[in-house]
Amino acid sequence: MLLQKINSPKDLKRLSIDELKTLSAEIREIIINTVENNGGHLASNLGTVELTLALHYVFDTPEDKIIWDVGHQAYTHKLVTGRAKDFHTLRQFGGISGYIAPWESEYDHFAVGHAGTSLSAALGFAKARDLKGEKYKVIAVIGDGALTSGMALEALNQIGYLNTDLIVVLNDNEHSISPNVGAIALYLAKLRKHPLYRFFKQTTQNLLKNSSIGKGLLAFDLKLERSLKSLLLENPMFEYWGFKYFGPFDGHDIPVLISVFKGIKDNLSCPVLIHITTKKGIGHKDAEATPSKFHSIGAKIEREKKVPTYTEVFGKALVELGEKYPEIVAITAAMPEGTGLSYFAQRFPERFFDVGIAEEHAVTFAAGLAKNGLKPVVAIYSTFLQRAFDQIIHDVCLQKLPIVFVLDRAGIVSDDGPTHQGIFDLSYLRLIPNMVISAPKDESELRDLLYTAINYPGPFAIRYPKSKGVGIGLKDHFERIEIGKSEILKYGKNVLILAIGSMVYPALEAESILKTEGISPTIVNVRFLKPLDVLTLEELISSHDVIITVEENVITGGLFGAISELVNILKLNKKVLPISLPDKFIEQGNAQLLRDIYGLSGHKIAEKIISVLEDVKV
């Protein structure tokens, strides 16, 4: 295999064009086999193989800096930068990351996992280079989906204004996770589909591939191309932003990519945007046909009995409620399938809004809808809702607007690593006035909390994990839950275990283990982090000797903080002991393995409590 000879990008430069094409096929096979075993991002990585090889072939990395957006399309980059031998550990505990990781390689310049960051970071690299008097190229690689984010557009504005030597490669595959939406997507489609421009592109690409092209010929070709674009397009958007724009080019045509990159590298030292078009999932029949389904896939596991995920339960419950409440509208940021809102979108397309990768806009857009009498449900992954923190405070909670925030992927999120762990939401939401914060113990309670939230006249957050439910039966109706009311699941003595959300069932498992040791704890489903069930908790805390909080959240600011503050305010003279995630970023790994490591599984909770009781001699 050719890949066995590639220890660094310098080895790529010795290959012929035909060998690069052969290497592309090898890399696709390795990516498919690895992702089918380990899980990971399949379609996006299959679409960027040739692009990645051409970038490393032309530019002198790591001296020249390639700054990737999101990073979930960089598997080829990892394979040709010395990590091929470890690629089988992709996304595994202790293995290589599925994203760009500077602690892993000198070729990974900027840690990433969220969309829209590459242009700002690349501009920072470029300006630092200029101020230090250094000479190298900075190349930002961003997808058309990420380009819709406000942060990316802010950076484009600044890059053009500063007239900085910076190359932006726009990888246009018409998708982020789901098909792209919005005016920018329509603009790029106009570029791709204009018949005269497509004829011109085919002609020039044949010239680029089949001729011995000198700098002068390439410069002429690029100039002619830009002139033709001005005739075809009324508003050459990127030119107005101060970029020299070239493309679209076929992102799977290695000779064309190499020629274009070389010409621009050698001739231009200003903001340049190179527009390439790629096919997401190319090389895998199913991923190519339905790239959204193969954006990210799970590892191979044994088939279990059919238990719906929390995502599925939420999505279907919202459709049921949508039938009853015509004021319900649903909003997501480029993830209708991932959040379960695809069910609602199919049933009520006119009441569904996918705003693209624009979480800040999503929240304030929802605020406007709520202000005018509608009931927005905003479904966003926990880790991505962080991006709209100011909007939640300023535009929603300050005005007490009736918006339901549905935080999918809360808690530990298996193999995607620190950028995707949903372990901060209890903390960052709890400090905001007027916000109700809840977490269901199971899928049935999720349905009832959603129903409760729809009928609540203010901001209401529901968080739940990326997992199947616990397997209990679902009622055929909804029941409203009293706001702030906890649930006592087991009555015991001496030891009080206060658990929330995904930690309630592990706490019950721990209770069964503790019983065999002669320990009979009281188990409480806290359910609402805010407001707390003060009366019930005061009575329970006062009547127990050992108070334990259990949460799948960092220790700072979540359930432990809330109960500790309550104990202090009520002057209860009790010590609260936390079982939570530590004050650190949590690495990648199987979710259950990580819960074991950090003491959040049932048997680990029991072990911790036994240890505590030995220390306090209860």
Swiss-Prot record:
SUPFAM superfamilies: Thiamin diphosphate-binding fold (THDP-binding), TK C-terminal domain-like. CDD domains: TPP_DXS, TPP_PYR_DXS_TK_like. Signal peptide: none annotated. Its cofactor is Mg(2+); thiamine diphosphate. GO terms for biological process: 1-deoxy-D-xylulose 5-phosphate biosynthetic process; isopentenyl diphosphate biosynthetic process, methylerythritol 4-phosphate pathway; terpenoid biosynthetic process; thiamine biosynthetic process. The keyword Coiled coil does not apply. One of its GO terms (cellular component) is cytosol. It comes from the Bacteria. It is an enzyme of class 2 (transferase). PROSITE patterns: TRANSKETOLASE_1. Mg(2+) binds at D144, N173. SMART domains: Transket_pyr. Belongs to the transketolase family. DXPS subfamily. Catalyzes the acyloin condensation reaction between C atoms 2 and 3 of pyruvate and glyceraldehyde 3-phosphate to yield 1-deoxy-D-xylulose-5-phosphate (DXP). This is 1-deoxy-D-xylulose-5-phosphate synthase.
